[in-house]
């Protein structure tokens, strides 16, 4: 672990909608229009361009627009109906409050609200959006270091791959795709689970969170002199997966299989189907296998606690419903699905390639997340 001195400004994509409603609390300046703004507004696209409205006042504007607070210490802004948990089982809308600048751009299919702020201010919210701000001090410190490392690794990587990155491999026999922050072209990271949860300042203002951030300021994880592309999860099911089996096909030696247990937990080779089956049907003594409501309420936000059976779970569908679901989720018409066969498992036992056989088509799909998306209205649990 080392200290990182250059902490950049970030652009975080918050809200994606045909119309964006926001409130500027304080005086904000927009250089595009040369005007000052305060109060409640909405912006939407019309046949003649973009219209910024406040009460009865209508103002044609050109995008992008950036609203910059005159006093960053006392000013903030609110965004209405921010969708969190996008396409996950906890998806919902929240009204959220942010510090820093508000930038609005056009991404063709929708308008996008972007928050521009410092990295450390961003982390102040992230560590209490991903976990509850009442978590123990060491939990908060660890999360601050992990989240800072992940973010800086993405920023450094973007300098080398922008415009050249592909996150899928498709041919007649396989549809292989993975998801990462490279899905975003017009800002650094998004504010949702796709990247890291960043839900504004309302959840972040606790002394413990600020103290954890200050205690670890600038600290990052490194491997052979390079900032680690650190990843985290709330529940690993007893064993973690290798990076290249879940995301892009790049091996990071520091992101390999480990067991989540007080002692080295013997799992066997979980790439083997029979061994994996035995593991999945068991309940090993893992740290994340807890039903202690007091612990869970201390570390998890309310909507995360709605998921009761997160360590082991089961989902079933009638064949006709499953066939329709798969077609709707990935746009591939298998006809009536006759068989689903595991082709490859990762070192944690997770499926990373699955063969779907229908009366119209047979295809292998992967990686882990596209499998979870394909067989669920939202996502299967990981």
Language model features: what each stretch is:
Residues 1-382:
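Conserved, single-site charged/polar hotspot
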């Amino acid at each position: 672990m080392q200290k990182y001195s250059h902490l950049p400004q970030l652009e975080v994509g918050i809200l994606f909608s045909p119309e964006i409603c926001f409130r500027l609390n304080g005086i904000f300046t927009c250089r595009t229009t040369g005007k000052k703004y305060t109060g409640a507004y909405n912006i939407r696209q019309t046949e003649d361009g973009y219209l910024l409205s406040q009460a009865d006042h209508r103002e044609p504007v050109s995008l992008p627009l950036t609203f910059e607070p005159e006093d960053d210490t006392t000013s903030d802004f609110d965004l209405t109906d921010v969708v969190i948990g996008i396409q996950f089982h906890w998806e919902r809308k929240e009204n959220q409050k942010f510090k820093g600048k508000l930038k609005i751009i056009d991404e063709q299919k929708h308008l996008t609200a972007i928050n521009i702020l410092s990295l450390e201010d961003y982390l102040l919210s992230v560590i209490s959006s991903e976990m509850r701000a009442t978590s123990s001090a060491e939990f908060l410190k660890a999360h601050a270091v992990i989240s800072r490392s992940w973010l800086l690794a993405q920023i450094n990587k973007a300098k080398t791959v922008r415009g050249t990155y592909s996150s899928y491999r498709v041919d007649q026999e396989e549809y292989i795709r993975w998801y990462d922050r490279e899905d975003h072209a017009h800002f650094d990271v998004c504010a949702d689970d796709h990247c890291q949860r960043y839900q504004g300042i309302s959840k972040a203002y606790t002394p413990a969170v600020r103290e954890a951030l200050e205690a670890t300021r600038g600290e990052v994880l490194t491997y052979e002199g390079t900032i680690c592309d650190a990843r985290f999860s709330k529940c690993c099911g007893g064993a973690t997966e290798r990076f290249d089996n879940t995301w892009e096909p790049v091996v990071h030696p520091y992101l390999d299989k480990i067991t989540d247990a007080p002692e080295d937990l013997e799992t066997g080779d979980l790439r083997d189907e029979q061994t994996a089956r035995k593991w999945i049907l068991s309940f090993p003594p893992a740290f994340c296998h807890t039903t202690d409501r007091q612990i869970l309420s201390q570390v998890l936000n309310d909507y995360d606690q709605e998921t009761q059976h997160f360590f082991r779970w089961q989902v079933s569908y009638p064949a006709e419903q499953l066939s329709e679901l798969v077609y709707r989720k990935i746009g591939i018409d298998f006809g009536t699905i006759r068989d689903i066969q595991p082709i490859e498992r990762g070192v944690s036992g997770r499926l990373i390639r699955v063969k779907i056989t229908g009366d119209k088509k047979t295809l292998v799909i992967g990686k882990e997340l596209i499998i979870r998306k394909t067989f669920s209205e939202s996502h299967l649990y990981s």
